[in-house]
């Protein structure tokens, strides 16, 4: 059996920094998800029920719509809240979303972006993507500050976010129970 030693100090330091960054991100994620760190590291999510809890389908009243109907709602709205998520990052659609926001602002619509701390691949991912698309920082509003604004929003447009908007988090016994969510279901549309 060979005995190996790492004699490269730079490699050891780099490894320690990567490990420390990983622990820091894990702590931030566990805090934002309202979970103990060990639960996050072990992959534990709730009590083992299905993601929807007892109900197998969506809750509430569902209304079929079309792109044309959504466009009309957006243009005639006074206030629109965009809710970006991991799907936005995967589609690399942050510039298109920012362009839509600019178009609506040009029609006098108040536009803001609801930022969940764990949306995307890591904490702060949505902030970085939207800043890259030149969305003004003042329009990026975090979870605690944006949730009271949803009832006054004419439209909440969810773009690639699901777990951070899942109302099952409000029910005990679901895998996402207790995780803070964006209250998109409280908007007018």
Question: How does the language model describe each region?
Answer:
Residues 1-5:
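Conserved small/polar residues in nucleotide/adenosyl-binding loops
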Residues 7-11:
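Membrane-helix interfacial "entry" motifs
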Residues 13-77:
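Membrane-interfacial segments at transmembrane helix termini in multi-pass membrane proteins
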Residues 56-174, 179-188:
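Structured cytosolic domains appended to multi-pass membrane proteins
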């Amino acid at each position: 059996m060979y005995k190996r030693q790492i004699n490269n100090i730079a490699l050891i330091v780099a490894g320690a920094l990567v490990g420390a960054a990983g622990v820091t991100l894990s702590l931030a994620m566990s805090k934002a998800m309202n979970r103990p760190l060990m639960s996050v590291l072990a992959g534990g999510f709730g009590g083992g029920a299905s993601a929807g809890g007892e109900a197998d389908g969506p809750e509430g009243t569902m209304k079929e719509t079309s792109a044309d109907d959504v466009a009309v709602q957006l243009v005639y709205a006074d206030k629109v809240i965009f809710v970006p998520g991991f799907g936005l990052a995967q589609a690399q659609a942050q510039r298109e979303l920012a362009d839509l926001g600019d178009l609506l602002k040009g029609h006098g619509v108040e536009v803001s972006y609801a930022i969940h701390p764990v949306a995307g691949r890591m904490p702060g991912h949505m902030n970085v993507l939207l800043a890259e698309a030149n969305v003004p920082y003042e329009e990026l509003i975090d979870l605690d500050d944006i949730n009271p604004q949803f009832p006054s929003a004419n439209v909440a447009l969810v773009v690639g976010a699901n777990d951070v908007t899942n109302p099952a988090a409000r029910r005990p016994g679901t895998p996402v129970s207790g995780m803070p969510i964006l209250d998109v279901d409280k908007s007018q549309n």
